[in-house]
């Protein structure tokens, strides 16, 4: 028998959220959700989903239909708990793209780039003071962290401090953070001649929390390696993983 992930408590949270968004909950809705989580956890193909959950077509059709309607991200934001925003973190992480993710007809919908490690996607993640996901953006792996910084910072509604690594060391980014009434905790590059009065070594050491968040996301093999052709579907997989992390944390 296939291992399941949904406890009664987690399923109740998800089911209530589905109903709030007008989604019909049939008697096999829990099994369909288990099938989608099984795919997320194992990274296997949709056709390999155990029949004991439901036919693989049923699981795929529901996942794809809700992804196209933008429902998975709505579920995440509804299930996301109270954020601890005394300080927040932003960072990026490369994801290797499997050959099965190639071939999407519209290149603009792929978020796949060619970098030194081959074909990659990059997840740009913002987390709260507990290392729990606030939101994220995905781009091709050839996109530098600083290029997505402002979009990512916009997802952080309020915080006292924003902590990031040297990849975000740029004066326009620091100004943008300060304009949001946050203090940037970002180390200077080695060749920088500017003063860094705001830098706090203690707070910067806490940056492992965002790295831990990436580690939790990559426990799901469909996140650790990208198998989805469309950026929309891969993004939805990440939202489901973030949703599950929050449900477990409550």
Q: Where would I find each of the regions flagged by the language model?
A:
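Short alpha-helical elements
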Residues: 1-250
